[in-house]
C-alpha cells in the first residue's frame, strides 16, 4: 500500500498538482487549509482509505458555522464503483481537531489501472468543494483450490434450513449496520493469533467438491490460520462485540465492530470468552480456536468486512489510517 499526502491551500494550486479542476472556482485558502492523506496505490481486494483535516485560517462567525461534512467516491472508466461519507474522528484518538476518515472497498476482481478518487466536502458552512485524485490498482494473483467435503461438511454447506437462513440474515444485518460513532481505533490492527502458519489465504478462488458428486464455487473471504485446538484467539483491534454465538456454518463465532461499517470476524472456535456488548481492546482474549461448523480441521478463520464487502485483513495491520508514529507506539 502506497500513501500519498497533499496539503491544499487553494483550488488553483491543487489543479496544477493533480491536473484536476474543481467544479466550484472559489479560492478558499483565506478561510482554511485542507490536508488530505490517501491510499494512492493498492491491489484488488484492498480498500482505499482517506483522512482529511482542516486548519482554519480565518475565524468564522458562530452564526455562519454548520457541521463540516465530506463524501468520497471511486470510479473506473467513468463508472462509479462505490461511494461513502467521511466520519469524524474523536480528538482523543486523532490528537487534532476537524479530522475525518473514509474507506472505499475494492473487489478482489477489480481490474488493474488508474481509478478516479473524488472528494466532495463543505467546511463549516463554506460552499461545497470537489477534487479528484488518481489511485493506481496493481495486478495480483489469487490462489485457486479444490476442497473435497465429506458427508457431514457437504450437509452443512448445502443446508437451507430456516435456522441457517435466519443466522445468515442476522449476520448480514449486523454487517450492514453503520454506526457513525463507532470509531474505536485508528492505529494499525494486529494479527488475531501468534500462529503464523496459514492454510488458506484471502480471496482464494474455491471449488467445493461434495460427497454426492456435485460441486460449487465460492470466494474465501478471510485468512485461515493452522491453529491447534485451544489456541488463544485475540481481538485484532479495539471495538465492541456485536455477535458471539454458535452458528451452523461457522461454529463458535465472534464479530467485533471497530469503525463505522468495519467489522472483524472470527470463525470455527471451540470456546468463546466474550459476550455481545463487551467493549474490548486490541489483544484481548475472545476465544479458543477449534474446528466447529464447516471445517476440515482445526483452524481460525479471520475476516474483515467493510460495508459488507470482504477486504484483505493484512492491509489493516499496516498504518492504513495514517496515524502519527507517536500514536502507533501507544
Cite the ranges covered by each PLM segment.
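Bacterial N-terminal signal peptides that target proteins for export
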Residues: 1-8
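Cationic-aromatic interfacial patches
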Residues: 22-143
Amino acid at each position: 500500500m502506497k500513501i500519498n499526502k497533499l496539503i491544499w491551500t487553494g483550488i488553483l494550486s491543487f489543479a496544477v498538482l493533480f491536473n484536476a479542476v474543481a467544479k466550484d472556482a472559489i479560492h478558499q485558502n483565506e478561510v482554511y487549509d485542507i490536508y488530505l492523506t490517501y491510499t494512492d496505490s493498492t491491489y484488488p481486494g484492498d480498500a482505499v482509505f482517506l483522512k482529511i483535516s482542516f486548519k482554519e485560517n480565518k475565524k468564522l462567525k458562530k452564526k455562519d458555522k454548520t457541521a463540516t461534512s465530506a463524501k468520497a467516491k471511486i470510479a473506473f472508466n467513468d463508472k462509479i464503483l462505490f461511494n461513502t461519507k467521511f466520519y469524524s474522528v474523536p480528538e482523543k484518538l486523532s490528537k487534532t481537531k476537524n479530522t475525518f476518515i473514509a474507506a472505499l472497498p475494492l473487489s478482489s476482481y477489480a481490474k488493474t489501472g488508474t481509478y478516479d478518487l473524488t472528494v466532495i466536502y463543505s467546511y463549516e458552512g463554506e460552499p461545497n468543494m470537489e477534487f479528484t485524485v488518481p489511485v493506481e490498482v496493481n495486478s495480483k494473483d489469487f490462489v485457486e483450490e479444490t476442497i473435497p467435503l465429506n458427508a457431514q461438511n457437504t450437509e452443512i454447506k448445502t443446508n437451507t434450513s430456516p435456522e441457517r437462513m435466519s443466522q445468515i440474515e442476522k449476520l448480514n444485518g449486523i454487517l450492514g449496520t453503520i454506526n457513525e460513532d463507532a470509531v474505536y481505533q485508528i492505529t494499525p490492527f494486529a494479527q488475531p493469533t501468534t500462529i503464523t502458519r496459514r492454510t488458506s489465504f484471502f480471496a482464494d478462488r474455491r471449488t467445493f467438491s461434495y460427497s454426492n458428486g456435485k460441486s460449487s464455487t465460492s470466494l474465501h473471504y478471510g485468512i485461515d490460520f493452522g491453529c491447534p485446538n485451544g489456541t488463544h484467539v485475540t481481538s485484532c483491534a479495539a471495538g465492541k462485540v456485536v455477535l458471539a454465538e454458535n452458528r451452523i456454518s461457522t461454529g463458535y463465532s465472534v464479530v467485533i465492530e471497530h469503525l463505522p461499517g468495519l467489522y472483524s470476524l472470527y470463525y470455527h472456535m471451540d470456546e468463546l470468552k466474550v459476550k455481545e456488548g463487551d467493549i474490548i481492546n486490541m489483544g484481548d482474549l475472545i476465544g479458543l480456536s477449534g474446528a466447529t461448523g464447516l471445517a476440515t480441521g482445526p483452524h481460525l478463520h479471520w475476516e474483515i468486512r467493510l460495508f459488507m464487502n470482504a477486504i484483505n485483513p493484512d492491509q489493516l495491520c499496516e498504518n492504513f489510517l495514517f496515524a502519527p508514529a507517536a500514536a502507533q507506539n501507544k
